[in-house]
């Protein structure tokens, strides 16, 4: 039964004779129905029933075969008979859908081939073909299922199809999937289900670690939506918390019990601080999830991550890693801290989202980058919302002031801004008040801005991983997006990993790119050591002549101050000699 056929019934008007005859027949039928109370009452009931069938995404409601009515005579009986026939067809369709479930390993191989999934490990569980499988295979909680429906999650993405059954089987896992592929939901759904099932203990059971506050806040919002109206034993609601500065203080001062929350989401340093102050005990944590794992295990966070692991002392602790990029060194670390993990790769490990149109634009020098942005605006290619990434706070500020002169609706976000300022800017950008957001890599990971049309890498990213995460702010949730990377003569080495990502993502690569994309061992080592990074000039469109005059004037003022200072010192010495 097509829902649109129900809603548009009787709205067709045609010009030929047959259609006129049909139209008049419809009107006569309508007049006849008006004289029959039973017929008029059965039609809305039938339509309502058909609508319910169409909206029953997960087939968790039993659709009645007959419309309950005290009187069904004449035409009403024909309608019920027709309805029963359509219901039989629907049930036949349902049986076809049920037969498409993942039952055998051969079914799993076909499904994985469709989305280029690579799963390895011992005793790998079968993936789910639909959310319906969660009901039949795992006795999925109805309240959690309703929250999924209310938030318009109707079909699992590839990473969700693989991750959810693995985590529900309580296995350690390393998962890599493109940006915007639904990784957050892939670990939230099984985590919530496991906490609902675990009725033995009270207190903190799930811990989610994120490298940035913005990503942690986003995970908290999504988790709160799915945990809405879910109650555990003794009518206690499932509690989710974001470890903010305020909550840390309350835990430290014992205003709030540490056993109040079932799930806590936090950045590494804040969590370690609270644990060291003995305000929070991680001994009961059974599920530890690292989102953006490659960042959490690099040299910036690895010591903090190690402290978190040592604080989680439960012998049955399950560890999970998610990211859009998983370097080999992170996988090596994972193998040492995990127990027989399953490895899930969707697509290519170092590839970007295939929905993103990636381009490289040669700008000659730093001044050429500003000209290139203004060219995009003039040609109508600068389609908001737009995110521009730079390598440093100083350069982000400088570009912000330059674009303000162009009267663009723009703002800048970086680590020097307060959390309140950052939250307000992000909210304005999401609501459409801001058209362009300039930022550093603080926003490159995880944060979900729906509908971003364009990402501009004003400065070439320092690694292929950074590039994948930056451009991953667009092309999310199945939408298309565009990413442009500016480069100069100085970036000849730094763009090689980016060209390789473009090739692996299926982008068209010109001949000159093919020639320079291959890297020697020495070049790879120099990039790892950061030698590919170049010192960049200040962002400015002020002419060189004006800059020279300003510099000369500044030097003259400084020289004048020195002369005055030396004269005053000489006068003081002369006065001392006379006395």
Swiss-Prot record:
Any one Pfam family match given in the protein's UniProt record, by short name: DEAD
Residues that hold ATP according to the record: 177-184
Keyword Oxidoreductase listed: no
Amino acid composition bias (Acidic residues), ranges on this chain: 76-97, 569-579
Record's catalysed reaction(s): ATP + H2O = ADP + phosphate + H(+)
Motif Q motif: positions: 133-161
Primary localization class, coarse: nucleus
Any single GO CC term annotated in Swiss-Prot or TrEMBL for this entry: nucleolus
Positions of the UniProt region annotated as Disordered: 1-99, 520-579
The enzyme's E.C. designation: 3.6.4.13
GO molecular-function term, one example from the UniProt record: RNA helicase activity
Domain Helicase ATP-binding: 164-344
Domain notes: The Q motif is unique to and characteristic of the DEAD box family of RNA helicases and controls ATP binding and hydrolysis.
Subunit structure: Interacts with the U3 snoRNA and is associated with the 90S and 40S pre-ribosomes.
Family, as annotated: Belongs to the DEAD box helicase family. DDX52/ROK1 subfamily.
The protein's name in its UniProt record: ATP-dependent RNA helicase ROK1
Organism: Kluyveromyces lactis (strain ATCC 8585 / CBS 2359 / DSM 70799 / NBRC 1267 / NRRL Y-1140 / WM37) (Yeast)
Upper classification of the organism: Eukaryota, Fungi, Dikarya, Ascomycota, Saccharomycotina
Gene this protein is translated from: ROK1
